[in-house]
C-alpha cells in the first residue's frame, strides 16, 4: 500500500474507491498498485 498525496490509476485494472472520505486505488491484477491518499 502506497500512501500518496496524489493518487492516480496506474493501469486499466485500477479502480478508484472512496471509503469514509479517503480515496483509495485497488487493483486485482497487480496488488502493487494499491494506493491511499494521506
From Swiss-Prot:
Top-level taxon of the source organism: Bacteria
InterPro entries listed in its UniProt record: Ribosomal_bL36, Ribosomal_bL36_sp
GO biological process: translation
GO MF term list: structural constituent of ribosome
Gene Ontology cellular-component terms listed: cytoplasm; ribonucleoprotein complex; ribosome
Entry annotated with the keyword Ribonucleoprotein: yes
Keywords, alphabetical: Ribonucleoprotein, Ribosomal protein
Disulfide links within the chain: none
Family matches, as Pfam families: Ribosomal_L36
Family: Belongs to the bacterial ribosomal protein bL36 family.
Entry protein name: Large ribosomal subunit protein bL36
Organism of derivation: Gemmatimonas aurantiaca (strain DSM 14586 / JCM 11422 / NBRC 100505 / T-27)
